[in-house]
A protein has these predicted regions:
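Intrinsically disordered, low-complexity terminal tails/loops enriched in metal-binding residues
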Residues: 1-298
C-alpha cells in the first residue's frame, strides 16, 4: 500500500529529527560539569562569590578562579590537552537558565578574551576564540608544556541578569608528561622583551584601587610609536602567584593614532596581597610584543 505522506514528507521528518538530535548532543556535551571534577550544579542556583571578590558587580577584583558566577558558567568536556603541539580548547558559556550564551558585548575589540597559563605562571597565551552558532567557543592554542593549566574566559553579557557586567570564569586542564616547574622571577621594576624595556611604577595595594604607570623605552630612548592594540595602546593582565587569581588592569590612555607612549597609566585592582605576574602586550610596526614582570601587592 502506498504511503499517503510520500517520500518527500518522510525525508523532511527525518531531517527535522536529526537536527533536533544534533542540538540535544551539543547541549549535553557541556552539561556534565561546570566546576572542575564536581557533580553538575543546577543553573538556577546562585553561586556564592569568594571573599576576595568585590561586592560591587563588574569590579575588576573578581578573581576568576570559579567556573560559575551568579548562574553563569564556563562548561567544557575537555579535562586533558596534548603536549607539544597546537591544539583547540572548546567550551561554552551558559546562562542561569542553562542555555548557551551567544549574545556578548564587544570589549576591547572582541566579544570574549581567553587566557591560558601554567600553574608556575609560564606559557601565557591570550587569544580570541571563534563562536559557533550553537554557543560553542573554540580557542586555538599554541603548544602547551606538560603540567596543570588554567583556562580563563573574560566576557560581558549583552543581555540577561548580568547585562553589562564583566565576568571572568576559568577551568583547569591537565597536559600529560613530566612537568618541570620554573621558578617565578622575584619582583622587579623593569623587564625586557624584543629589545624593549618596560618599567612599572606605583604602589599596589590589595583590594584597593591603585594607579600603575608603565613606561616603555628602547635603547634608552622613549618609545612613542605604539600602535593601537585591542582599542588601547597596551593590554595588561595579572596572575597571582600560588592560586592563579586573575586581574585585568584597565588602561586609562585614550587612543590617538600610531604614536602612543612612552608612558601608559593603568587602573589596578588586585584581589590579594603577594606577588603577581604581569603580562603587558603592546604593538609596534604591526608586531605584538609581550613583556612579563613580577610585582608585589601589599
Amino acid at each position: 500500500m502506498t504511503d499517503p505522506a510520500g517520500p518527500s514528507l518522510r525525508r523532511r521528518t527525518a531531517a527535522a529529527a536529526c537536527a533536533a538530535a544534533g542540538l540535544t548532543v551539543v547541549l549535553a556535551a557541556f552539561s556534565f560539569s561546570t566546576s572542575n571534577g564536581l557533580p553538575p550544579r543546577h543553573h538556577s542556583m546562585t553561586s556564592t562569590p569568594s571573599p576576595t571578590m568585590s561586592s560591587m558587580p563588574g569590579m575588576a577584583t573578581m578573581d576568576g578562579l570559579a567556573s560559575e558566577f551568579n548562574g553563569y558558567a564556563m562548561a567544557s568536556g575537555t579535562a586533558t590537552l596534548p603536549a607539544g603541539r597546537v591544539t583547540d580548547y572548546r567550551f561554552a558559556i551558559t546562562s542561569p537558565d542553562g542555555k548557551p550564551v551567544t549574545n556578548f558585548a564587544v570589549e576591547q575589540a572582541h566579544r570574549l578574551h581567553f587566557y591560558a597559563i601554567r600553574s608556575d605562571l609560564t606559557g601565557f597565551q591570550h587569544v580570541h576564540p571563534t563562536l559557533a552558532s550553537n554557543g560553542t567557543w573554540t580557542a586555538a592554542l599554541a603548544a602547551l608544556r606538560p603540567g596543570t593549566w588554567r583556562m580563563y574566559a573574560s566576557f560581558v553579557p549583552k543581555a540577561g541578569p548580568a547585562r553589562g557586567q564583566e565576568i571572568v570564569l576559568s577551568r583547569t586542564v591537565s597536559v600529560p608528561g613530566p612537568a618541570v616547574p620554573i621558578a617565578v622571577p622575584a619582583p622587579s621594576r623593569s623587564a625586557t622583551a624584543d629589545g624593549y624595556t618596560v618599567t612599572v611604577t606605583g604602589k599596589l595595594m590589595a583590594n584597593r584601587a591603585s594607579p600603575l604607570v608603565v613606561t616603555i623605552t628602547k635603547d634608552g630612548r622613549p618609545v612613542t610609536n605604539l600602535q593601537p592594540y585591542l582599542d588601547t595602546y597596551a593590554h595588561l593582565t595579572a596572575f597571582h602567584q600560588g592560586d592563579l587569581a586573575f586581574a585585568h588592569l584597565h588602561p586609562e590612555t585614550k587612543v590617538d593614532g600610531d604614536h602612543g607612549g612612552p608612558t601608559l597609566p593603568f587602573h589596578a585592582e588586585l584581589s590579594r596581597s603577594g606577588d603577581w605576574r604581569l603580562f603587558l602586550q603592546f604593538q609596534t610596526s604591526g608586531t605584538v610584543h609581550t613583556a612579563a614582570i613580577t610585582v608585589h601587592a601589599s
